[in-house]
Amino acid sequence: MAMNINEIHALMDGLPIGAWVAISTDQRRVLSYGEDALQVFAEAKKQGEKVPFIGRVPDPNELMFF
Amino acid sequence: MRRITYPYSKIGIDNQARHRPMADVILIASNGESVRFEALADTGADFCLFPLNVAKLLGLRLDQLETATTTGVGNASNLTYCDDLTIDLGDGIIFTTRVGFTWGMDRAGFGLLGQQGFFENYNVEFRHRDRIFAIESA
């Protein structure tokens, strides 16, 4: 089942821009956040999440081009 | 036929908001490790590309991966590590393809679903005015 990215981003509100964040699969909880992606991932796994969602808090003022 | 419809992600507020065709994907490495991540459906990307940190989360050893150089806006040459991964979008849409990992994507914090593996295998409908897009298997 696909997760709703906007609901995931809503959970990131108030967290530091650019921080790595782990979100629970049920899209209800921030499991961990910080500057180190590996540490954030490890802390989420410690909480029993087998496949946590990992992302970064987006910067609303940043324009992106690829 | 399988079809998944997603709302565009919305970053920012009001008329300053950016709307992007983002999907959540599960990346599965050959070692069995997996991580859930967000990825932009990007017709301009030649292949699927993710932040280098994702390779580390998956436990991939960079010194054992093939390397290539990739080019994007602002960066003429990015060292990119490559491996074959399975990408699962859910609802039966799943494929295995060569994926690149580069530091250039770490700032973005999401990946790109590109031509190879993704657009070549699925019909993708963008309805930008409605802020939705759909991925459809044959």
Residue positions per predicted region:
Chain B
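Pepsin/retropepsin-fold aspartyl endopeptidases
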Residues: 1-138
